[in-house]
Amino acid sequence: MSKVKDKAIVSAAQASTAYSQIDSFSHLYDRGGNLTVNGKPSYTVDQAATQLLRDGAAYRDFDGNGKIDLTYTFLTSATQSTMNKHGISGFSQFNTQQKAQAALAMQSWADVANVTFTEKASGGDGHMTFGNYSSGQDGAAAFAYLPGTGAGYDGTSWYLTNNSYTPNKTPDLNNYGRQTLTHEIGHTLGLAHPGDYNAGNGNPTYNDATYGQDTRGYSLMSYWSESNTNQNFS
């Protein structure tokens, strides 16, 4: 066989491989129907959204301006009664970096949802607060409440900071502290986890996911790494 034909065959093989790769990539995010992911059902975007909103928790547009306007404050103190209510102890204020990153995390939600955030002592369609704790809640890295939980709970989110757990002290772009802030704010807006699991309730893993796309590759409300769905955001 001549070198010309050799090269032609190699070129054809390379083209075939390239087509296969492109075709595979073009179907990478196909969802729903009878598709499965890791042996689990594949949910469409609408099905996944319904899963996140299954608790029916949401703020109301009280002034009828067509959007949800929320106010927020960074707590400077917390009474013992408040700490007891949440099952935590060791209050501390957000540091400068936490405040700046919380504002950016809120902006990331405002960029994709019909919601605004204004730092103000009260008012709006709902009010959010941020604070740190050093122990309690079975060692959860953070926790927050869905709208409608009740007075003293709605809009509140708390973040673990102590000598043994430090990520929340230094949140930044692409690190776990920033991810935690954005995740917990998602809860205060009314979003649940994609599946029925929670920190402190046993030791859930991706095996407990209801559907295949329940990873951070598709929603930051998930507990599970995007690596479970063959993605890498690092």
Model-derived features with residue positions:
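Disordered inhibitory propeptide/activation segment of secreted metzincin zinc metalloprotease zymogens
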Residues: 1-94
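Metzincin-family zinc-dependent endopeptidase catalytic domain
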Residues: 27-65, 97-216, 223-232
